[in-house]
């Protein structure tokens, strides 16, 4: 077999350490032959043997006389030292015009001997022949190639890449099996090469041609799975493309992608026919041992277990990849040989605040592919601030402000109508942020001396102008707004148009928070495109940045997640704001269904779980006792698990973060809970518990101060880890969904009686209220609640007066007397007693309904029914109940909920949440 040596590889732009820029067929020559083929390889060295194998493109090799050696067959003795040897085919179809004389071959041997010194690495004290012989097999090829057309060498004609590869089309009809037969045979012994390569110096490894992942993918399979193509991104040198599970549709897409690449770049990287043949190899089922039928999540798991890198670290992704969108299953696999080259890239990812954040950071998903193609237009930004020029007063004197200072002052002035305006914490945080904009030497030095009345009055005038607008003007404004937002409202997922949930970037303003949030009043700065990361499909057009002169922070192509965009929360940078598809999208519907199925599955295990934690109430291990008591409280009271809070976050509490002072033991076995729950809503509840639970809580409190943790041996992660041991996938949150749904299902089944639709709706609202109380879904009483109740009361009194008149007229009709005049002085037509009785019945029903509505409004004034409907109640329970009792679903679900739960509308009327 002929060999070729290179004096120095030609690098483009210093990217010589990248081997992914070479055609993939070139990398296949890196495969090491098996020991069983040693004798055959030796015999091939002694004489040239013609072959149909396609020769890879090479960098030009400069000989002493200034000519480029031919890649024709050369006779090279096995004892000849060479720093870079390459087993090449006997005849290359790329350069079929070169002479094959003995003189040329001897000249090539001379050139190879002279360039040996220039490629010596850290093993300078040893001849390469001894290293090669130590491997007990033919040496693997090592050669570096430039992806660009090569430069002239001493006046020689440049080895133009396109012209050479075009000549290769004559071999398009050659069967791939014959072209790559030797490669497949040699791939069987690739396992022994890994240990030898690990011992080689890094420089020597970098000069090798390609980085085959020998410990993960057999060489024979890689050859059959990867078509010849060019990756133009030099930054992806260390990332190997994984095997692609192709379907008949994807084969066509790949062929079209090849044609497009030829048209766009004006050069042929590979014959379309050849690429189609390589792809069809997979379709014909010739690769019996591939893993295309293995779920992608398992393949990710296998990759991470075979790699020395931590699976927790996200893999670097090059954003400007030219990969086609027709390759949905492409994965980045880092070979052992290329780990050193990816060190810097991984470090950047690790140090990023997004990857290291411990709270809601964008992850790589669960490894399951959520979509194949994704196209959207990004997000829409709020309009820029328009200055009004109104001055505020400081100690009675007008003060000039810059545009930035005026914008923030206006944010504060327009909140004069709210309670926040007078809250000390709100004013303090606002002043601290506004003072930074004003500067230390500004005339305004104290917030209390500022009078924002001029701006507030301007604000009221603007509101009044909007109210005075005609219907046509309002309609025109609305249409203009819709026209601007239309293109941002939709995404195309796998060819299906889906509505996006919230595509608007939040405008700047003053943070309010819920309850007594410690950050209320802080400035929410304006979000810019350079802070936003987008997620789209590979090959999809990158959304145009709507703000001139700016650009997106990053563009990802992660099909294991469903978010479309995210950015850091301006108030709490450890948290993120996401843009997802709408609630009615197929992806969201599937996610909801899986959530409720997981909770429903708990019905099969709940008895065993309760038996387990009851037994552990008396466990000797304190940690096990605390886990048992915490699980009991989460199960019986539907408490949230709770997470640790930073000092600058609202001091809300969950089960695992309860303090000793939040729990009071009341003999003989009652516990009073008093703490600030999620959204800073106070949770106050006194419940009767099991005697063993009462005793255990008393023991947990012993010797501790009120600010100490009640469960000092426990946190949320430990609790969830224990629950997952009992039931795979079980977390504390599943208990809330289970308890909410099972409560609704049982109450509706037990309390629904025959009656009209209105009465049945009252039964549903009562059950919904019970769920809301269990989940502590509270709300503050509306400011207009009192006025609404007064209005209803007055209306009921009016109806009762009318009822009295009707009853009086009924009595007069029975006596044959004419009816009395109405309260408005008008005469009333005489009617038969039956007609008066009918009017009385209608009026009584109207009064009864209004009284029922008023009672419900008063009863639910502090209870939020919507939260449990949206997040915790299996919608199939409601839909099935409505079908069984002939209640229109529109009476229970709003229009938005009907869209969100479209997947549940086909449920059978007999559906029950409990499978028992």
Curated annotation (Swiss-Prot):
Pfam families: Topo_C_assoc, Topoisom_I, Topoisom_I_N
CDD domains to which the protein is assigned, alphabetical: Topo_IB_C (cd00659)
PROSITE patterns tied to this protein: TOPO_IB_1, TOPO_IB_2
Known tissue expression: Expressed in inflorescence meristems. Expressed in primordia of sepals, petals, stamens, carpels and ovules. Expressed in midstage embryos.
Interaction with DNA, annotated site positions: 466, 514, 563, 595, 652, 678, 720, 777, 795
Broad class of where this protein is predominantly found: nucleus
GO CC annotation: chromosome; nucleus
Biased composition (Polar residues): 60-76, 130-148, 230-239
Gene disruption: observed consequences: Defects in phyllotaxis and plant architecture. Morphological abnormalities of several organs. Defects in cellular development and organization of both the shoot and the root meristem.
Modified residues (Phosphothreonine): 286
UniProt record, GO biological process: DNA topological change
Keywords: Coiled coil, DNA-binding, Isomerase, Nucleus, Phosphoprotein, Topoisomerase
Something else known: Eukaryotic topoisomerase I and II can relax both negative and positive supercoils, whereas prokaryotic enzymes relax only negative supercoils.
Quaternary structure and interacting proteins, as annotated: Interacts with DEK3.
Name of the featured protein: DNA topoisomerase 1 alpha
Species, as recorded: Arabidopsis thaliana
């Amino acid at each position: 077999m002929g060999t070729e040596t290179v004096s120095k590889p030609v690098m483009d732009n210093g990217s010589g350490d990248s081997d992914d820029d070479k055609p993939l067929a070139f990398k296949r020559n890196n495969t090491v032959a098996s020991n069983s083929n040693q004798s055959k390889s030796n015999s091939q060295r002694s004489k040239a043997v013609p072959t149909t194998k396609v020769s890879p493109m090479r960098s030009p090799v400069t000989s002493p006389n200034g000519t480029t050696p031919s890649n024709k067959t050369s006779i090279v003795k096995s004892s000849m030292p060479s720093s870079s040897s390459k087993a090449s085919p006997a005849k290359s179809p790329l350069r079929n015009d070169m002479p094959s004389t003995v003189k040329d071959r001897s000249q090539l041997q001379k050139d190879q001997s002279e360039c040996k010194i220039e490629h010596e690495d850290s093993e300078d004290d040893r001849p390469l022949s001894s290293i090669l012989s130590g491997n007990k097999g033919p040496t693997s090829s090592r050669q570096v190639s430039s992806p660009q057309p090569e430069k002239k060498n001493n006046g020689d004609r440049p080895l133009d890449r396109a012209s050479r590869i075009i000549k290769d089309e004559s071999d398009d009809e050659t069967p791939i099996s014959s072209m790559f037969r030797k490669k497949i045979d040699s791939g069987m012994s690739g396992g022994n090469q890994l240990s030898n390569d690990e011992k080689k110096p890094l420089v020597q490894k970098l000069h090798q041609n390609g980085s085959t992942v020998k410990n993960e993918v057999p060489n024979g399979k890689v050859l059959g799975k990867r078509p010849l193509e060019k990756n133009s991104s030099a930054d992806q040198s260390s990332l190997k493309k994984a095997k692609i599970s192709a379907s008949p549709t994807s084969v066509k897409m790949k062929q079209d992608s090849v044609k497009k690449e030829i048209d766009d770049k004006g050069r042929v990287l590979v014959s379309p026919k050849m690429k189609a043949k390589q792809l069809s190899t997979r379709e014909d089922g010739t690769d019996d041992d591939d893993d295309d039928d293995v779920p992608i999540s398992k393949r990710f798991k296998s990759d991470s277990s075979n790699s020395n890198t931590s699976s927790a670290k996200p893999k670097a992704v090059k954003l400007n990849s030219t990969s086609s969108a027709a390759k949905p299953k492409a994965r980045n696999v880092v070979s052992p040989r290329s780990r050193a080259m990816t060190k810097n890239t991984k470090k950047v990812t690790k140090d990023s605040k997004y990857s290291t954040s411990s709270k809601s950071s964008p992850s790589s998903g669960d490894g399951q592919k959520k979509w194949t193609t994704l196209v959207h237009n990004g997000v829409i930004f709020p309009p820029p601030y328009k200055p009004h020029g109104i001055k505020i007063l400081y100690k009675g004197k007008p003060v000039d402000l810059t545009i930035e200072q005026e914008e923030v002052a206006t944010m504060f002035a327009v909140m004069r109508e709210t309670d926040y305006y007078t809250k000390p914490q709100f004013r303090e945080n606002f002043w601290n942020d506004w003072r930074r904009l004003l500067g230390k030497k500004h005339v305004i030095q104290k917030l209390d001396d500022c009078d924002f009345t001029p701006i507030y009055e301007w604000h009221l005038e603007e509101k009044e102008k909007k109210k005075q607008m005609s219907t046509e003007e309002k309609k025109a404004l609305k249409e203009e707004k819709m026209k601007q937002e239309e293109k941002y409202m939709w995404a195309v997922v796998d060819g299906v148009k889906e509505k996006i949930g919230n595509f608007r970037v939040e405008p700047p303003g003053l943070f309010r928070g819920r309850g007594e949030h410690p950050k209320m009043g802080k400035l929410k700065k304006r979000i810019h495109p350079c802070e936003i990361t987008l997620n789209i499909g590979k090959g999809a057009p990158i959304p145009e940045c709507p703000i001139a002169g700016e650009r997106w922070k990053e563009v990802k192509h992660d099909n294991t997640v469903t978010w479309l965009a995210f950015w850091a929360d301006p108030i709490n940078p450890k948290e993120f704001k996401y843009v997802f598809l709408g609630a009615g999208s197929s992806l969201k519907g599937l996610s909801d269904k899986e959530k409720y199925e997981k909770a429903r599955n708990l019905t099969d295990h709940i008895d065993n779980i309760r038996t387990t934690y009851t037994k552990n109430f008396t466990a000797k291990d304190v940690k096990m006792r605390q886990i048992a008591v915490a699980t009991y409280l989460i199960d019986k009271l539907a408490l949230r698990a709770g997470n640790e809070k930073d000092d600058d976050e609202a001091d809300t509490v969950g089960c695992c973060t309860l303090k000793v002072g939040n729990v009071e033991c009341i003999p003989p076995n009652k516990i009073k809970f008093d703490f600030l729950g999620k959204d800073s809503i106070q949770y106050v509840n006194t419940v009767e518990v099991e005697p063993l639970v009462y005793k255990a809580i008393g023991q947990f409190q012993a010797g501790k101060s009120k600010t100490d943790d009640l469960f000092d041996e426990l946190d949320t992660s430990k609790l969830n880890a224990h629950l997952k041991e009992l039931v795979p996938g079980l977390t504390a949150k599943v208990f809330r969904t289970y308890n909410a749904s099972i409560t609704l299902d049982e109450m509706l089944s037990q309390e629904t009686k025959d009656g009209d639709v209105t009465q049945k709706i009252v039964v549903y609202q009562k059950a919904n209220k019970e769920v809301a109380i269990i989940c502590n879904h509270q709300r503050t009483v509306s400011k207009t609640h009192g006025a609404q109740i007064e209005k209803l009361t007055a209306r009921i009194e009016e109806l009762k007066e009318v009822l009295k008149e009707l009853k009086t007229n009924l009595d007069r009709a029975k006596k044959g007397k004419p009816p009395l005049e109405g309260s408005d002085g008008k005469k009333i037509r005489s009617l038969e007693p039956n007609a008066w009785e009918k009017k009385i019945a209608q009026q009584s029903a109207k009064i009864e309904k209004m009284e029922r509505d008023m009672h419900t409004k008063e009863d639910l004034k502090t209870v939020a029914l919507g939260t449990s409907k949206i997040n915790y109640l299996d919608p199939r329970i409601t839909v099935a109940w409505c079908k069984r009792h002939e209640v229109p679903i529109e009476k229970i679900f709003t229009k938005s909920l009907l869209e969100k739960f479209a997947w549940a509308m086909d449920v059978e009327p007999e559906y029950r949440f409990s499978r028992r």
